[in-house]
Structure formats: C-alpha cells, structure tokens
Regions:
Chain A
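C-terminal motif of bacterial Sec signal peptides marking the signal peptidase cleavage site
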Residues: 14-17
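Phosphate-group recognition and catalysis centered on beta-loop-alpha active-site segments
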Residues: 19-415
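Sec-dependent signal peptide recognition
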Residues: 2-10
Length: 415, 249
C-alpha cells in the first residue's frame, strides 16, 4: 500500500512540477568589448544611420530588408519576421562599431551580433556629417551563446519616406512595453520595462491599472498574485485585497522589481523616457475613476512643465468604466480612450477611439474620428500579415501590439 | 483585454479525491478471489492488445490539462471531457475513435491500429486523423478555428492479471490550421511538424469487470489545439502535462 501511495504521489509531483518556463538570456559581448574604448555618436550622426537597409548576407534568418532606427539609448534593427537587434554603438575615429544581440520575438532564438561601418563605407560621412557615402554595415551574428561566426552585411537603401518619418504614428507596446511571456529580461508592468521598451521600437505604452485596498492605483495585469508574474511570496489572491504598504513590502515581480504605483510609472515615463503615449487600461477598478483621473491630470501638468509632448489617456474598456467616467465632474474634458462604439466616444468626448482590430479597418469610422479631431488606434494586433495590412491599408494613428518591432518595420518601410 | 477560455485543471482540491479513488480501488482489486478468471486484456482500451473482432467498447472520463503560463494568464479553466472508443476488426486490426471537448474547442479523431502480442508484452502501431473545430462567440468575440491533424502512433504494453501498463508515443503533424476572428483569417498554416506526445497509462480493475484508466501524458508541442482561442503567435515548444481519469463503460 505504501508503495502504491508513493507511486501516485510521484506521478502527482511530476505532473505539477515539470512546467518551468524560462527567460531567454541576453547574450553579452563581455568585458573585452571594443565599445569600452569608443566614443558616443552625436544626435545628428545617429539620424544619418536611420533608414531602410538591404540584407546582403544573413537574409535567410533576418529577411531581405530591415530598418535601422535609433531610440533614446540604443540602435534597434527591426525585421519583418519578428526578429530584432538591440545594439550599442560607438566610434573610434571614423569607424563605427556596433555590438549587441538579436532576438526572435516569436520564439526563443537569440545570439550575439557584432558589426562595424568602415571609414570608406559610411563611417566618415556619419561622423563628420558631410559627403555622400552609401552606408555598408559588415559583421557577423551568432546563435545562442556562441561567438558571432555567421556573416551579416547590410547596405543602406534609403531614408525613411516622408510619410513614415513625418507622421505621428503611435507604436504602443502592451503591458508597459512587453509581456512577461515574451521572456524579456525585465517584468511586465514595471519601471524597468518602461525604460526598456523603446529598444523594441515602442513610442508609447499601455499599462494595466488596479487599485489597492487603501485606494492607491498601481500597475498589475492579472486578477491575482501568481507565480507567472511575481516571485513566490507570502501574499496570494487578488492584489486589490492588500494595502499598498503590503504589496510594496512583500511582492516582487518575476524579475525582482517592485510593483510600481501609477504615479511612479507616469513620473518615470515623463522624466526618464521619450515615450509619447500612455494608455491606462483600467482593470476592474469600479469607482476608482476619480482617483486615477486626478493622478492623470497632475501628471499631465508635470509633463507640460517639463515640456514633454505626451498623451496620457484613461481607458474605457467597458460600459461600467464608461459610467464610472461619467460620474467624475467635468468628465468630457478628461483625456480618455474609449474601446466601445463611436457614439460612446462622442458621449464622453474621448480623445481616442480604440476598437478591437478584429472588427476590421473601419476606414470610414476612423475618418469620422479624424474629422472630429480625435485619434483612432486599434488593439491588440500581433500577426505580421495583419500588421502590414493595417499599416498600409488603414488610417489608424497607431497600433497596440505585443510585437512593436514588427509594427516599426512595417511603419518605417512605407514608401 | 483577453477574457478567454482555455482548458485547464479541475480545482486542485479534487485531485486528492481522484488519487484516493485510484489507490483504494487498486488495493481492493488485489484482494480478488483466487478462482477469479478476470483478465485485464479483454476490457482494456489503452493497452495495445488485439481487440476482439467486431467488439465495441467505450470509455469516458476527464482530462485535466495544465497549459503553460505563457498562454494561460487570466483564462477561465475547465476540464476536457473525453470519450474514447475501440472497434475490433479482423486481421489484428482495430479502429479507435476519440472525442475531446471543452465546448468552445472540440477534437474528433479516428484511426486504425494493428497489434501484436508476445506473452505478456503487446505492441501496436496506428495512424489517427483528427479534426478540431472551435468556436467562441461570447463577450464580444467571434472567433473560429478549424484544424486537421495527423497522429502516427506506437504503443507498447505489459500486462499482469488485473493490471496493464501502456506506454504510448505519437508524433503530431498539423495538416491545416485556419483561425478566424470577426470573419478575418488570423492565420492559415499548413503541413508542419508540431511535436510529439508521450503517455503512460495504467488500466486497473477496481471490482468485477469494472476497469479504471489512469493516464499521464506529456504533450511537447508548439500548437496545442484546446488553446486555439488565444491566437498565440509564439513559435515555441511547450511541455503540456495532461492527466486523465477514465472509466471503461
């Protein structure tokens, strides 16, 4: 009998113990990277590198064409198949060195990448800002933790088109910039993710807002505290059951970060990033609209004082949230994003209409919104073929996605 | 923004009850009468023996699945209902059918087996073709999925008088996968290797001719059909454990 009990107990343990998800490690160039001896590029030099590039060698993995786009901290390369590069860049004299990693956002593929731009192949032009050279980037990439040993060569084809460069198109990343399930090095809905997401091509973020037992709005997606999003700890059940002091003291996100309050997150976004759109996705926060909108108003004033051109909208995903907003005095002047019908948008004078992408392009309704001075976004679109169609055939002002680098690719390659 | 249904486990509080049932049932079964002529071969269903010609047998039960946390998020959990059928044919052949459902996602499979035995060891090989149909038209969604799959499979088994052990492996190929949302084709994929599964099954007499099947299966797959409504774009293999409790009717 004991043997049988042990037998079934072991099976039980196997069943519940074999589902360990992983994080994809970021390959590092190591302490001997040449970048330690280089100098940073100027802003004008960085702009000269932005553009559409042809992949001469390496197209089997990265496609035949990529875009290079500088963000606040890094040079990002986006492919049309969900792969992207995050590169550190520096110069020595007129030679430009790029070192970093590539990652496949749809799977766990990753590897080191090391490239350079020689003096005569665009380096001099980039550093001096004069002359006409076609930029050629030569280098190699690796797979996993191996050293880069496979050839990767890129040739600049053109600058971004006026349509792509001049239009204010919002590339909104889900969960403050990326999901934990995307196996990024930082946790979703954390300050670290807000600081990280620009490397993925994001220009704005969606964050999930909940309210503590003592009325403090904070960022967290799931309905309960769980090991998908947090480290094992003493608290369990709905996060809203706890006070902010309890959450702050006892809960750490899956990569060790603290859960941020909404105010911390918005302050960080305004002060420390170039993100220009924040969508506050209200998660079961019945009756808390006044609290959230007062923080929103204060943060918009803070942004204005800093000279930051940023949109912060409170989300209206349900009729319950719509009614909550209507209960706030002066609700028609509160910047909001309504996921419901265009009539609901008009009823609360939302700044943004955001239908689910599966409802179609709806170009006529989008145009109506534009004519009324509103923006139109759609959510949450992840398949490359649909991202391409919505960018090339649609009139939306932006897309909410889990794969901002794919949206960036299709947006910046528009002719 | 993703209020979706996925399969999951029944409440964990029920698991000890199942385990208790199996353990106590096993204990009772071992006290069977010495004159008892019971042979597990005849009523077993997962065991790869040659099924009796023109015989038909049905088992029904529940599958409890633990989808990976990458996919699960806030999904509502429900066990899958499973009905398994065997129909004996001449020349060591049999036909096996299987229905699995969580209402919004359903798989129907059918395939032949050919089996051999040597003393207490048995072996069979088969090929199942499955069709999945899923539909979710609640809470503002209008999503559908249709999938054709192939499951070439091998089983080996060893039997005692009242107990049979079966190890079964199958490869999983997706022939065609079509998912639509709001009338838009979200994805169409064809002809890809999707992974494999390895399952262990214990068939145990509880009393008289009543047999219980306990199964533990690891689905190592990229696309796990019951989770179609998540429209995942991940191109990763996941270990998806599946616990089954079935009763041969």
């Amino acid at each position: 009998m004991k043997i049988k009990i042990t037998y079934f107990a072991l099976l039980f343990l196997v069943f519940y113990g074999c589902n360990k998800d992983t994080t994809v490690p970021i390959p590092m160039a190591g302490p001997n990277s040449i970048l330690g001896d280089t100098y940073p590029l100027t802003s004008s030099a960085k702009l000269l590198m932005d553009g559409v590039y042809k992949v001469n060698d390496g197209s089997g993995l990265f496609g035949s064409q990529v875009i290079l786009k500088w963000n606040r901290t890094h040079l990002s390369i986006a492919c049309n198949n969900g792969k992207y590069f995050v590169m550190d860049v520096g110069r020595l004299d007129s030679v430009i060195f790029l070192q970093g990693y590539w990652r496949d956002g749809y799977s766990d593929g990753t590897g080191l990448a090391s490239m350079h731009i020689a003096r005569g192949e665009g380096g001099t032009m980039i550093v001096s800002g004069t002359g006409q050279q076609t930029i050629v980037i030569r280098g190699a990439y690796g797979q996993g933790s191996t050293l880069p040993d496979q050839v990767l060569n890129l040739t600049r084809l053109r600058s971004f088109s006026t349509k792509a460069a001049a239009s204010k198109f919002y590339i909104l990343a889900h969960r403050s910039g990326g999901r934990t399930s995307d196996r990024l090095p930082v946790s979703e809905n954390s300050l670290a993710m807000i600081g990280f997401t620009e490397r993925l091509g994001s220009t704005g973020i969606e964050v999930d807002v909940r309210i503590t037992k003592d009325g403090i709005p904070f960022l967290y997606h799931d309905g309960d505290l769980n090991i998908r999003l947090t480290e094992k700890g003493p608290l369990a059940g709905p996060a809203e059951n706890y006070t902010w002091a309890q959450l702050s003291a006892f809960v750490r996100l899956i990569h060790g970060e603290k859960i941020p309050t909404l105010e911390e997150a918005l302050t960080y976004t305004i002060d420390s990033t170039l993100l220009n759109f924040v969508y506050l996705d209200m998660k079961e926060t019945s009756g808390a609209m006044a609290t959230v909108t007062s923080i929103q108003e204060r943060m918009l004033q803070h942004a204005a004082a800093k000279g930051r051109d940023i949109i912060i909208v409170v989300g209206i995903p349900t009729t319950g949230a719509l009614n909550d907003l209507k209960s706030v005095p002066g609700y028609q002047s509160i910047p909001s994003l309504c996921e419901l019908t265009v009539d609901d948008v008009r009823a609360v004078n939302s700044m943004v209409w955001a239908p689910r992408w599966t409802l179609g392009l709806q170009n006529d309704l989008v145009q109506q919104m534009h004519d009324e001075g509103r923006l139109a976004l759609c959510w949450t679109i992840d398949q490359p073929n649909w991202i391409e169609e919505y960018i090339t055939q649609g009139h939306f002002n932006g897309l909410l996605t889990n794969f901002p680098y794919v949206v960036a690719y299709y947006h910046y390659t528009q002719q | 923004m993703k209020p979706l249904f996925t399969p999951g486990s029944i409440p964990k509080s029920l698991l000890p009850m199942f385990i208790f049932l199996v353990v106590t049932g096993t204990s009772v079964a071992q006290k069977a009468d010495a004159a008892d002529t019971f042979d597990i071969t005849a009523p077993s269903m997962r065991f790869p023996h040659q099924y009796r010609q023109w015989g038909f047998q049905v088992a029904a039960g529940l599958l409890m699945v633990k989808p990976p946390m990458d996919l699960l998020e806030n999904a509502i959990q429900a066990p899958l209902v499973n009905i398994h059928m065997t129909f004996g044919l001449p020349w060591r052949l049999s036909l096996e059918g299987d229905v699995q459902t969580i209402v919004v996602s359903n798989q129907f499979s059918l395939g032949p087996r050919i089996g051999y035995g040597y003393r207490n060891f048995y072996f069979n090989a088969g090929w199942d073709v499955a069709w999945v149909y899923g539909q979710l038209r609640q809470i503002g969604f209008d999503n559908r999925a249709k999938v054709w799959l192939h499951y070439p499979n091998l089983s080996v088994g060893y039997k005692l008088k009242r107990m049979a052990f079966t190890l079964r492996g199958e490869a999983v190929f997706v022939a065609k996968l079509t998912e639509t949302s709001g009338g838009n084709e979200v994805s169409v994929s064809r002809n890809f290797y999707n992974g494999f599964t390895v399952g262990f099954y214990l068939e145990q007499r509880l009393w008289k001719n009543h047999v219980f099947i306990f199964g533990l299966k690891d689905n190592y797959e990229k696309y796990y059909w019951p989770t179609w409504m998540l429209f995942t774009t991940f191109n990763r293999y996941y270990h998806i454990p599946e616990l089954s409790f079935m009763w041969i009717l």
